[in-house]
Amino acid sequence: MFKIICVTDRKLCDEDFLTRIEKIASAKPDRIIFRDKNCNDEEYVKSALKILAISDIYHVPCSMYFHTEIFSDIHMTMPMLQHICLSDINFQHFVGVSVHSVDEAIQAEQQGVDYIIAGHIFETSCKPDLAPRGLEFLKQVCESIKIPVYAIGGINANNINQIVQTGADGACIMSGFMTCKSPVAYISQLRKAVTEK
């Protein structure tokens, strides 16, 4: 089944962040990835524990950035992966990595990660100065590895079906989840768009 994943960005949220997280969790995305580049480690862990408590209530898997000593479901950047050995991490960890090239995707799979996020695919306000890598790049990534590939970058209800057509296993969405009026209605719209021919 094609997965819809929420990636957080506190800066985009115009209401209490944890209130927004609860609304998103109640809408049942396939996963929430807690991303916050604007806080220190201590603040991140405190927020992460609160978010994990919310996601557990709604039975939504939640990935945290790194902090392998605390969390078992983690996401990391490629530079982070290159500085650790996954075999040294508890085998119970579920690990995802963000990649920006086919070579990185292959390397991540060889190092034993469970999934990758590839991007950015379409133009996005999050990376205004970087050209999108496009659908052909995403298709090449999907054809190069066997683990799940999730796309990210500028994805919405109007283009998510193009992501499906590349063979990707899911889509990660940030601004849509952070700014929509109703996460329940928003995710329903996305799931409907996924199945359109």
Task: Kindly give the residue locations of the regions a language model identified.
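Hydrophobic faces of well-ordered beta-strands that scaffold small-molecule active sites
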Residues: 3-8, 32-34, 62-64, 72-77, ...
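Glycine-rich phosphate-binding active-site loops on the catalytic face of alpha/beta enzymes
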Residues: 6, 74, 78-88, 117-129, ...
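Short, acidic/polar
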Residues: 11-25, 67-68, 100-107, 156-161
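Structural motif
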Residues: 24-27, 111, 144, 165-167
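N-terminal active-site wall of soluble small-molecule enzyme domains
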Residues: 31-89
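Alpha-helix-loop-beta-strand connector modules within alpha/beta enzyme cores
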Residues: 47-66, 87-101, 129-157, 190-197
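Glycine/Thr-rich beta-alpha phosphate-binding loop at enzyme active sites
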Residues: 73-80, 96-143
